[in-house]
Amino acid sequence: MKSTAGRGVCGASQWSAARETARRASKLDEEGLEVVVCRHGMLLRALNMYRGEIFAYPLYLQKELQAATNGQFYCTDIACKYWPYIEKLAVSMLDLRPLLQMRPFLSVMHAKAHSTKCEIIWSGKNQEGAGTTAGEEVEMVNSYLSRCALTTKYMTKSARNDMLTVHAIGWNRQKKKCLHLALSSRYIKTFKKAEAESQRLEDLSSELGCPENIVHQWVHDVRQWATDGTRCDDDQSNLQKSIEQMFLGVHQKKASLYNQTDSNKIRHLRRRRLWEEKRKLFDTIKLYNEQVPDEERIVEEKVVSGLSVAGGDREAESVIWPWEVHSSESSNILTKKKIFDAYMSKVRHEEEKIIVMREMRQHCTYLKRMADNIRTVISEISSGRNSGCLNEEGHRGLLCLLQKRLADVEEKFQVVCSSYRQALGPNASSLLEDGPEEMLEDHEEVDYESSDDSDFEGV
């Protein structure tokens, strides 16, 4: 399969992970670790990287998990580049076509560094059925495993693998132990936030003069604007790309000025370089403004506001350039995007309530089935049907272990159900019902797939 030339650039930022090939490091055998986690932070798979971050690693992990689970979403920080790569491979490799059934999901925080249109199309907060999954859970695992780096770099390969495995097992054990607390807390927070987001959408609609029957039309208009990729002529297009790249470069360097430096000497050098790039950016903006009509010019004050890191204005998070706006919508696309963001936030929180309730039910059902299976094994051993070659003493010891395990599972089941009932309140009556309809309550308009579906993230 011939690799696609070019860099992994999206809206001006260059992503080192968005590439198909990479050179081996001359002084390193293993360059890092790539992991996959579920939306609850449990580590599912991991592999050693030998050639930096390339598409082949998440492809392998996704293929392994797709065969073992029924994942609905896969999340990466370069989903907009990774999805075309899978589509290209699926044309010639039939065994990879099932991967196209999973939906791409751009992690919410990483989406802020992508272009505005890319964020609207790919970000998890705009994906139907994703709930409020952030897609950044893998960063917690990376932070935890990074503690091993001080010691594992002096170990042999086998000892290093054992050390990382022990830490991964400990991480998953702790996550599994506290799962009922995490789900209960998540449901309570989501329930409160859903009411707040619904009220925020109503207030914003009243403020902007957008009645309820127009909200869906504005949401559709924003999606259509994001999928429209028309550009100007070649000369202006080159200037536009340069402005986007320089703007995001200055913004990111300014944001990381104190995070990635620990001495005034280095900060002084970076400030000087930052000032030069900022001057070059505004020179390019002036050159662009000389070539376009007055209504299509870039307002330098908005660019300065967008470069402000300390500002809390949401409009500063993403600048919408004049060439990104349809000529007929130049006055109201920003207004429509405010409604779009508020509407998506409301819908995602409503979805999250259903998802968490379904996960609570799955957790209780899992513990109940485990207890039933242990009782079945105890019954078979007690009746002598499954005693094997054990002597009488071993037979009694095995029964004691199984009874101890059964007592632990039953106690865990009671604790979990009590926690969920306290969090759900009146909705707890359907927690262990056979039919999933009771859990949907008044949210019949939300259509979900099988309860076996899961979301996982690979970075």
Where are these regions (language model features)?
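Catalytic-core elements of nucleic-acid end-processing and repair enzymes
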Residues: 1-459
